[in-house]
UniProtKB/Swiss-Prot annotation:
<protein>
    <recommendedName>
        <fullName>Uncharacterized protein aq_1287</fullName>
    </recommendedName>
</protein>
<keyword id="KW-0472">Membrane</keyword>
<dbReference type="GO" id="GO:0016020">
    <property type="term" value="C:membrane"/>
</dbReference>
<dbReference type="InterPro" id="IPR016059">
    <property type="entry name" value="DNA_ligase_ATP-dep_CS"/>
</dbReference>
<keyword id="KW-0812">Transmembrane</keyword>
<dbReference type="GO" id="GO:0003909">
    <property type="term" value="F:DNA ligase activity"/>
</dbReference>
<feature type="transmembrane region" description="Helical">
    <location>
        <begin position="13"/>
        <end position="32"/>
    </location>
</feature>
<keyword id="KW-1133">Transmembrane helix</keyword>
Length: 219
């Protein structure tokens, strides 16, 4: 009987310790300047965020009227963004021109994005689709009015299948079809390598480089 009482006492002490650990962990997270940590993570990847107003809540950050710059160029703008801490994840919602897009980052190692008429980047007129990044890239995405240094591509449809992708490109009334490979860099997603080609009607478009430095060749 004494052994049982001792075991219960140890269990209660362990439970109290675990509860205290979780409580003080959440408390420190709630009081920590989360935007500074978030901003530091962006700067490490040469991404700079400017917002007119920042509001920090206990488990979330709200950003109002901001822009994101990458490699000294404007990458996107937004009217409102909210980043919330979930169970083993960080969830984000981006509001721009009345449309909401979502992104979810899991601490288990995956990222999921959902775009709904996203039109807040100078490089693309509109983006729709869903993409999941885990051991590879999965999902579909449609880009309308994609601007390159060489030409304006009317529409791009891509289907990601892990380490490969297939799709089509509409350009000057022509439809080019092709495929390619993605060599994923888990430590730095923007350094993942891309090698793809689209052909049709005697025209060939070659895409090579990394996600942060894509080069488009037309022949």
């Amino acid at each position: 009987m004494k052994k049982k009482t001792g075991g219960m006492r140890i269990f209660k002490v362990f439970g109290l310790f675990l509860f205290s650990l979780i409580f003080f962990g959440l408390l420190s997270l709630a009081t920590f300047p989360k935007f500074l940590l978030f901003d530091r993570l962006l700067i490490q990847n040469k991404i700079f965020l400017i917002a007119q107003k920042v509001k920090e809540n206990s488990m979330s950050i709200e950003l109002f009227k901001g822009k994101v710059y990458f490699q000294n160029r404007e990458a996107l703008e937004f009217d409102y963004t909210k980043l919330s801490l979930g169970f083993l994840s960080v969830n984000g919602k981006i509001l721009c021109r009345g449309k909401i897009s979502e992104i979810s980052y899991s601490f288990l190692g995956s990222i999921e994005t959902k775009f709904r008429d996203f039109s807040c980047t100078p490089f693309v007129k509109k983006v729709n689709g869903r993409i999941e990044l885990s051991d590879g890239i999965y999902g579909r995405v449609k880009l309308e009015g994609f601007k390159t240094e060489l030409a304006l591509l009317d529409e791009i449809n891509l289907n990601f299948k892990g380490q490969t992708f297939t799709g089509s490109v509409k350009y000057l009334g022509m439809e080019l079809k092709g495929q390619g490979r993605i060599t994923l860099n888990r430590k730095n997603f923007l350094m993942s390598k891309v090698d793809g080609e689209f052909k049709g009607n005697g025209v060939r478009i070659k895409v090579q480089g990394t996600l942060n430095n894509l080069r488009v060749y037309m022949k």
